[in-house]
Amino acid sequence: DIVYLTGIQQSHTGIEFEVSAQLNQMIRLDAGVSMGNWVYTDDATGTYRDGTEDKTYSYALKDLKVGDMPQAGLNLGLTATPIEGARVQALYRFYALHHSDWDPTSREFSDGENPDRNASWRSPSYGILDLNVSYDIPFEYSGVTSQVFLNIINALDAVYVQDATDNSRYNAHPWRVGNHTANAAEVYLGLPTSFNLGLRFNF
């Protein structure tokens, strides 16, 4: 059984802004912000073919938000170079307006029915702080230099929803109440605090 959907169209618009400033000899500030508006622009139709006849279905998509990606973000980075060869950076990342992933075929409706035009569940906004430290070892051998580094990802151990599926048929809350709610969503949490320590050689 195959359903052929036609007329699915999305509009992706938005703005991005980035700025950098060397505050003094040791401190550099980097910032960036983005805001998007990603929506389905019209309803769609689908044709079901079972080998003997075709049946047409309608799908209520117009003005619904595209899911599975945050539509707003903010980045702030502060980098310090206290001594020659040393670099310490704090990077804060903030994400918002993240609608959960959803299937357009779930919005099927027939003539005379009241279609479901409610947006998919929007997961909570969240922010993550990363810390990065590196030091260029002041030693060179035959053109080979080295650097030691430490990266701490999600340094504050924030708990956040990284991805979600709207109205999950598999992992929604067993006492789910209402469509397009947190109880009806399947969520994937982001990773807790992690770090990596390494030595890099440059040839």
Question: Language-model features: where?
Answer:
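C-terminal beta-barrel architecture of Gram-negative outer-membrane proteins
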Residues: 67-141, 164-166
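C-terminal beta-signal and adjacent terminal beta-strands/loops
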Residues: 95-106, 136-203
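Gram-negative outer-membrane beta-barrel transporters
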Residues: 2-104
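Conserved long hydrophobic alpha-helices within structured protein cores
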Residues: 24, 28-30, 121-133, 152-154, ...
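Hydrophobic, lipid-facing positions within transmembrane beta-strands of outer-membrane proteins
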Residues: 13-17, 72-76, 127-133, 148, ...
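Surface-exposed loop/turn segments flanking beta-strands in extracellular/periplasmic regions
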Residues: 1-4, 50-58, 109-115, 168-182
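Short, P/G- and charge-enriched loop/turn segments at secondary-structure junctions
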Residues: 4, 62-64, 118-120, 182-186
